[in-house]
Amino acid sequence: MSKAPSQPAKKWMSARTLAKSEDATNRKSNTAAPASQPSQQPASVMHERPTPPPPAPVQLPQSVFFERQEAVDTLSNLYRNAQSVKKIETGPAAFEARDISKVHEELMDCLRPAAAA
């Protein structure tokens, strides 16, 4: 004689699979509930998302590190410029020496046609 099992044998399921099946049954029960009950909120309120308040302006203190870094950068730029100026001054002259008033007149002559056009 064979004994008939009183309960059907349960198959082992992982926690993830159990959570999925519970989620699926909850979705089925949740989709059936709103159809039977009228919604309490108007449709426009249901579709609105709550907007967070705008962030308050924050005053950040100036960093000493960045101030120092700017000073170091400025000094190194001045040093490089001084070296390049020294090289230019000791090299041969690229242009003949001119009076500053003549240079100014030439610049103004170049700008006049552009302004008139």
Swiss-Prot record:
Subcellular location: Cytoplasm
Recorded phenotype for the gene knockout or disruption: RNAi-mediated knockdown in the bloodstream form abolishes cell population growth.
The entry's keywords: Cytoplasm, Translation regulation
GO term, biological process aspect, one: post-transcriptional regulation of gene expression
Signal peptide boundaries: none
Organism superkingdom: Eukaryota
Region called Disordered, residue ranges: 1-60
This protein's record includes keyword Cytoplasm: yes
Main location: cytoplasm
Low complexity biased stretches: 32-44
Function: Involved in post-transcriptional regulation of gene expression.
Name the record gives this protein: PBP1-interacting protein XAC1
Protein's organism: Trypanosoma brucei brucei (strain 927/4 GUTat10.1)
